[in-house]
């Protein structure tokens, strides 16, 4: 699917309160990916092991989702790409989580817990890397705005994150 990036995207997505099928909770080990998030995009992502995301991939459409994720006992807002990454022509469907506001070293082999609270947009193909990066930054802004509502922000303290 291609999109006209000149069209105005909403600044907030989802209903006022979290509704079914959300929240979706899962956990999995952070594994090595393609190394593109940090190097090419300047937007580091954590790839979740295939076995941990099979259920998610079976029942969720490809696209960009938002919610919270915990790694190393810290909870962060996140955006997650689920799909084939058509710009890169991936052969396997994957789930890649970008922890918003997190800086620091890699955390390969750590267990990440994820709560998905909503859907931002479908997976798209891009003519150039700059448009992809621009859209990811828009996704981050939309996710933060959407999670600023009390029904969503309360999930930052969800019992799923108590370990």
From Swiss-Prot:
Gene Ontology MF annotations: ATP binding; riboflavin kinase activity; zinc ion binding
Transmembrane domains' residue ranges: none
Lineage of the organism: Eukaryota, Fungi, Dikarya, Ascomycota, Taphrinomycotina
Family: Belongs to the flavokinase family.
Assigned keywords, A-Z: ATP-binding, Flavoprotein, FMN, Kinase, Metal-binding, Nucleotide-binding, Transferase, Zinc
Pathway assigned in UniProt: Cofactor biosynthesis; FMN biosynthesis; FMN from riboflavin (ATP route): step 1/1
Cofactor(s) recorded in Swiss-Prot or TrEMBL: Zn(2+)
Binding site for Zn(2+): 45
SUPFAM superfamilies noted in UniProt: Riboflavin kinase-like
Keyword Zinc assigned: yes
Catalysed reactions listed for this entry: riboflavin + ATP = FMN + ADP + H(+)
Name by which UniProt lists this protein: Riboflavin kinase
Co-factor note (free text): Binds 1 zinc ion per subunit.
The EC number(s) this enzyme carries: 2.7.1.26
Gene name per UniProt: fmn1
Pfam families: Flavokinase
Organism: Schizosaccharomyces pombe (strain 972 / ATCC 24843)
Oligomer status and interactors: Monomer.
Active site: 96 (nucleophile)
GO CC annotation terms, alphabetical: cytosol; mitochondrial inner membrane; mitochondrion; nucleus
GO BP field: FMN biosynthetic process; riboflavin biosynthetic process; riboflavin metabolic process
Role according to the record: Catalyzes the phosphorylation of riboflavin (vitamin B2) to form flavin mononucleotide (FMN) coenzyme.
Keyword Nucleotide-binding: yes
């Amino acid at each position: 699917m291609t999109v006209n990036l000149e069209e105005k995207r909403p600044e907030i997505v989802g209903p006022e309160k979290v509704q079914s099928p959300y929240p979706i909770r899962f956990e999995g080990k952070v594994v090595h990916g393609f190394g593109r998030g940090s190097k090419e995009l300047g937007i580091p992502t954590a790839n979740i092991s295939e076995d941990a995301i099979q259920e998610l991939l079976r029942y969720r459409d490809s696209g960009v989702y938002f919610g919270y994720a915990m790694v190393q006992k810290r909870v962060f807002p996140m955006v997650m790409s689920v799909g084939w990454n058509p710009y890169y022509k991936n052969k396997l469907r994957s789930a890649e989580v970008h922890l918003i506001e997190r800086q620091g070293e890699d955390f390969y082999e750590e267990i990440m817990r994820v709560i998905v609270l909503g859907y931002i947009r479908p997976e798209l193909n891009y003519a150039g890397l700059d448009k992809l990066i621009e859209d990811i930054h828009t996704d981050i802004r939309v996710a933060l705005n959407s999670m600023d509502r009390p029904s969503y922000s309360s999930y930052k303290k969800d019992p799923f994150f108590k370990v």
